[in-house]
Amino acid sequence: MVLSVVEFSFLMDTAREIERFCHLIYQKQFVAAQDGNISARLPDGSVMCTPTRCNKGFAKADDMIVIDMKGNKLRGERKPSSEIAMHLLIYEMRPDIKAVVHAHPAHATAYAAAGIPLNKALISEVVLALGCIPLTQYGTPGTSELTDSLKPFIPNYDALLLANHGVVT
Protein backbone atom coordinates (compact mmCIF):
# COMPACT_ATOMS: atom_id res chain seq x y z
CA MET A 1 0.00 0.00 0.00
CA VAL A 2 1.45 3.34 -1.09
CA LEU A 3 0.94 6.30 1.22
CA SER A 4 0.49 9.90 0.19
CA VAL A 5 2.96 12.46 1.50
CA VAL A 6 0.34 13.69 3.98
CA GLU A 7 -0.41 10.15 5.23
CA PHE A 8 3.29 9.34 5.58
CA SER A 9 3.91 12.61 7.41
CA PHE A 10 1.06 11.89 9.84
CA LEU A 11 2.37 8.36 10.51
CA MET A 12 5.86 9.67 11.20
CA ASP A 13 4.52 12.43 13.48
CA THR A 14 2.54 9.83 15.43
CA ALA A 15 5.55 7.52 15.67
CA ARG A 16 7.71 10.39 16.95
CA GLU A 17 5.04 11.29 19.51
CA ILE A 18 4.92 7.68 20.77
CA GLU A 19 8.73 7.70 20.90
CA ARG A 20 8.61 10.90 22.97
CA PHE A 21 6.15 9.38 25.44
CA CYS A 22 8.20 6.16 25.65
CA HIS A 23 11.22 8.23 26.68
CA LEU A 24 9.11 10.26 29.11
CA ILE A 25 7.63 7.26 30.95
CA TYR A 26 11.11 5.72 31.11
CA GLN A 27 12.69 8.92 32.46
CA LYS A 28 9.92 9.28 35.06
CA GLN A 29 10.57 5.65 36.07
CA PHE A 30 7.02 4.60 35.23
CA VAL A 31 8.55 1.63 33.38
CA ALA A 32 11.81 -0.26 33.58
CA ALA A 33 13.50 -1.55 30.46
CA GLN A 34 10.92 -3.48 28.41
CA ASP A 35 7.91 -2.87 30.68
CA GLY A 36 4.74 -1.19 29.49
CA ASN A 37 3.42 -0.26 26.08
CA ILE A 38 1.89 2.67 24.24
CA SER A 39 -0.50 2.87 21.30
CA ALA A 40 -2.37 5.48 19.30
CA ARG A 41 -5.47 5.13 17.17
CA LEU A 42 -4.91 6.31 13.59
CA PRO A 43 -7.55 8.11 11.50
CA ASP A 44 -8.15 5.05 9.30
CA GLY A 45 -9.00 2.93 12.37
CA SER A 46 -5.68 1.12 12.54
CA VAL A 47 -3.43 1.36 15.61
CA MET A 48 0.22 2.30 15.94
CA CYS A 49 1.97 0.68 18.91
CA THR A 50 5.25 -0.10 20.53
CA PRO A 51 6.64 -3.51 19.61
CA THR A 52 7.20 -6.35 22.02
CA ARG A 53 10.43 -6.29 24.04
CA CYS A 54 10.99 -2.61 23.36
CA ASN A 55 13.09 -0.76 25.91
CA LYS A 56 11.12 2.48 26.29
CA GLY A 57 14.24 4.46 27.18
CA PHE A 58 15.72 3.72 23.76
CA ALA A 59 12.58 3.46 21.62
CA LYS A 60 12.76 5.01 18.16
CA ALA A 61 9.99 6.15 15.84
CA ASP A 62 11.14 3.52 13.33
CA ASP A 63 10.46 0.78 15.91
CA MET A 64 6.72 1.44 15.92
CA ILE A 65 4.36 -0.88 14.13
CA VAL A 66 0.86 -0.50 12.73
CA ILE A 67 -1.82 -3.14 13.22
CA ASP A 68 -5.47 -3.47 12.35
CA MET A 69 -8.18 -3.84 14.99
CA LYS A 70 -7.79 -7.62 14.88
CA GLY A 71 -4.09 -7.37 15.75
CA ASN A 72 -2.78 -8.16 12.25
CA LYS A 73 0.45 -6.34 11.45
CA LEU A 74 0.14 -3.85 8.59
CA ARG A 75 3.47 -2.02 8.85
CA GLY A 76 6.73 -2.40 10.71
CA GLU A 77 9.40 -4.99 11.24
CA ARG A 78 8.75 -6.26 14.75
CA LYS A 79 5.87 -8.01 16.51
CA PRO A 80 3.23 -6.06 18.43
CA SER A 81 3.33 -5.89 22.20
CA SER A 82 2.15 -9.06 23.91
CA GLU A 83 -0.50 -6.95 25.65
CA ILE A 84 -1.91 -5.32 22.51
CA ALA A 85 -5.27 -7.06 23.04
CA MET A 86 -5.80 -4.80 26.06
CA HIS A 87 -5.30 -1.72 23.87
CA LEU A 88 -7.56 -3.04 21.11
CA LEU A 89 -10.33 -3.81 23.60
CA ILE A 90 -10.17 -0.26 24.96
CA TYR A 91 -10.35 1.21 21.44
CA GLU A 92 -13.25 -1.09 20.57
CA MET A 93 -15.25 -0.23 23.68
CA ARG A 94 -14.36 3.47 23.78
CA PRO A 95 -14.43 5.19 20.36
CA ASP A 96 -13.50 8.46 22.11
CA ILE A 97 -10.09 7.10 23.18
CA LYS A 98 -7.22 8.12 20.88
CA ALA A 99 -4.23 6.72 22.81
CA VAL A 100 -3.52 4.12 25.50
CA VAL A 101 -0.57 3.95 27.88
CA HIS A 102 0.16 0.91 30.04
CA ALA A 103 2.91 1.43 32.60
CA HIS A 104 4.11 0.31 36.02
CA PRO A 105 4.61 3.47 38.10
CA ALA A 106 5.80 2.39 41.54
CA HIS A 107 3.08 4.02 43.63
CA ALA A 108 0.18 2.96 41.40
CA THR A 109 1.59 -0.56 41.11
CA ALA A 110 1.93 -0.72 44.90
CA TYR A 111 -1.77 0.11 45.28
CA ALA A 112 -2.60 -2.48 42.61
CA ALA A 113 -0.46 -5.14 44.31
CA ALA A 114 -1.99 -4.32 47.70
CA GLY A 115 -5.49 -4.63 46.26
CA ILE A 116 -6.39 -1.01 47.03
CA PRO A 117 -8.46 0.89 44.45
CA LEU A 118 -8.04 4.65 44.21
CA ASN A 119 -11.73 5.26 44.72
CA LYS A 120 -11.56 7.94 47.41
CA ALA A 121 -10.81 11.64 46.98
CA LEU A 122 -7.35 11.43 48.55
CA ILE A 123 -5.62 13.71 46.07
CA SER A 124 -7.75 16.40 44.46
CA GLU A 125 -5.63 16.55 41.29
CA VAL A 126 -6.24 12.87 40.60
CA VAL A 127 -9.96 13.21 41.21
CA LEU A 128 -10.19 16.23 38.89
CA ALA A 129 -8.07 14.70 36.13
CA LEU A 130 -9.13 11.05 36.22
CA GLY A 131 -11.88 10.57 38.74
CA CYS A 132 -12.08 7.26 40.56
CA ILE A 133 -9.47 4.68 39.52
CA PRO A 134 -10.90 1.22 40.17
CA LEU A 135 -8.94 -1.99 40.67
CA THR A 136 -9.55 -4.80 38.18
CA GLN A 137 -9.39 -8.50 38.97
CA TYR A 138 -6.03 -10.12 38.28
CA GLY A 139 -5.55 -11.38 34.76
CA THR A 140 -2.35 -12.95 33.47
CA PRO A 141 -0.62 -10.42 31.19
CA GLY A 142 -1.07 -11.14 27.50
CA THR A 143 -4.11 -13.41 27.99
CA SER A 144 -7.86 -13.10 27.54
CA GLU A 145 -8.07 -13.36 31.33
CA LEU A 146 -6.57 -9.84 31.48
CA THR A 147 -8.85 -8.34 28.84
CA ASP A 148 -11.91 -9.99 30.37
CA SER A 149 -11.08 -8.38 33.72
CA LEU A 150 -11.13 -4.91 32.10
CA LYS A 151 -14.48 -5.15 30.30
CA PRO A 152 -16.74 -4.06 33.19
CA PHE A 153 -14.64 -0.93 33.79
CA ILE A 154 -13.68 0.41 30.36
CA PRO A 155 -17.00 2.13 29.54
CA ASN A 156 -16.96 4.26 32.69
CA TYR A 157 -13.33 4.93 33.64
CA ASP A 158 -10.32 6.60 32.01
CA ALA A 159 -7.70 4.89 34.18
CA LEU A 160 -7.58 1.42 35.70
CA LEU A 161 -5.33 -0.21 38.27
CA LEU A 162 -4.50 -3.71 37.06
CA ALA A 163 -4.35 -6.05 40.05
CA ASN A 164 -0.76 -7.14 40.78
CA HIS A 165 0.37 -5.57 37.52
CA GLY A 166 0.30 -1.81 36.90
CA VAL A 167 -1.98 0.79 35.40
CA VAL A 168 -3.59 1.53 32.04
CA THR A 169 -4.87 4.94 30.95
PLM features: what roles do these ranges have?
Residues 1-5:
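Short, low-complexity, charge-dense intrinsically disordered segments
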Residues 6-169:
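Glycine-rich flexible loops
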